[in-house]
Amino acid sequence: MAVKVLVVDDSGFFRRRVSEILSADSNIQVVGTATNGKEAIDQALALKPDVITMDYEMPMMDGITAVRHIMQRCPTPVLMFSSLTHEGARVTLDALDAGAVDFLPKNFEDISRNPEKVKQLLCEKVHSISRSNRRFSSYSAPAPQPASAPAPAPSSFASSRSPAPAPAPARAAAPAASANSPAPKRKAYKLVAIGTSTGGPVALQRVLTQLPANFPAPIVLIQHMPAAFTKAFAERLDKLCRISVKEAEDGDILRPGLALLAPGGKQMMVDGRGAVKILPGDERLNYKPCVDITFGSAAKSYSDKVLAVVLTGMGADGREGARLLKQGGSAVWAQDEASCVIYGMPMAIVKANLADAVYSLDDIGRHLVEACL
């Protein structure tokens, strides 16, 4: 069955070109278009599309406001179009936090020339996020909290640094995959490495806000994201978390209580001296940054002292790096299917029998504390 798509943009040219590109795929059907956020809400309710492509700047109602309304009234996977600027990064992160699943740079020059790469990427993203639909509503909703639990983490990125909530106590009924996983083994890890893609910005926020300021292990983060976005993303996480978060620079020293985010468009490696190396992005690799590259360097530098975590994302990036980590005796965790936006990267870990444990997203931060403190 074809994926039904609603295209939302105030530019007639962009609506037409996006519709043409998507309609050229026999497995995608453009069921409608809208010129502003208000129309998008009405069309989403009437047409019940599988995926919505959404611009940000529009008259009457902007894209982020529309996404919030759609998530409340008819939760639907949204693919945001954004500009590759610092402001575009801020807006895109706001949209992801409001409930959008993924994003694509909005480049009129590229889309007007209709290059094959743009067509392929757009269609791949639509197909990928359409598969998140069956569990999308439950993922978008705040995680349930016991009556005695501390206040939950804010649903949006904080505008200023504030104390993060204490890790929530274990719930009585966890997803089956989590319930069957062993309790984490306490160990003096020298590094925690977390890799993710689609759905990662929100997932990383949920995990990192549960870590205390005195978290004893250095952390490296690999999120598939363009170069213009990673600095803004690191700054946002830093304002929300009790640990410090920054975009990694060449020569940065790994230290407890600090998370270094791999810069977009480049590769990040760690060395045995406790520093990171930032290398140019290799055009032969699909991902810049690439989880496999960072995991592989960690396996070489830290042997059995790494705790790797693979979160939501499409594809299989991280699997080969995790294999090297396992060969060296390190531990690998995967996010469970029920809490993933896209169960791709974690599934690759599980299917390759590389996962020491499979945990629900809301439990991973707590388990990191248990394993490392």
Curated annotation (Swiss-Prot):
The modification 4-aspartylphosphate is found at D55. The active site is at S197, H224, D317. InterPro entries: CheB-like, CheB_C, CheY-like_superfamily, Sig_transdc_resp-reg_Me-estase, Sig_transdc_resp-reg_receiver. It is an enzyme of class 3 (hydrolase). Residues 136-181 are annotated as: Disordered. One of its GO terms (biological process) is chemotaxis. GO terms for molecular function: phosphorelay response regulator activity; protein-glutamate methylesterase activity; protein-glutamine glutaminase activity. It is found in: Cytoplasm. Keywords: Chemotaxis, Cytoplasm, Hydrolase, Phosphoprotein. Its EC number is 3.1.1.61, 3.5.1.44. Residues 143-153 have a biased composition (Pro residues). CDD domains: CheB_Rec, REC_CheB-like. Pfam families: CheB_methylest (PF01339), Response_reg (PF00072). One of its GO terms (cellular component) is cytoplasm. Residues 154-181 have a biased composition (Low complexity). It catalyses: [protein]-L-glutamate 5-O-methyl ester + H2O = L-glutamyl-[protein] + methanol + H(+); L-glutaminyl-[protein] + H2O = L-glutamyl-[protein] + NH4(+). Residues 182-370 form the CheB-type methylesterase domain. The keyword Transferase does not apply. Belongs to the CheB family. PANTHER family: PROTEIN-GLUTAMATE METHYLESTERASE/PROTEIN-GLUTAMINE GLUTAMINASE (PTHR42872), PROTEIN-GLUTAMATE METHYLESTERASE_PROTEIN-GLUTAMINE GLUTAMINASE 1 (PTHR42872:SF3). Involved in chemotaxis. Part of a chemotaxis signal transduction system that modulates chemotaxis in response to various stimuli. Catalyzes the demethylation of specific methylglutamate residues introduced into the chemoreceptors (methyl-accepting chemotaxis proteins or MCP) by CheR. Also mediates the irreversible deamidation of specific glutamine residues to glutamic acid. This is Protein-glutamate methylesterase/protein-glutamine glutaminase 2. It comes from Pseudomonas fluorescens (strain ATCC BAA-477 / NRRL B-23932 / Pf-5). The gene is cheB2.
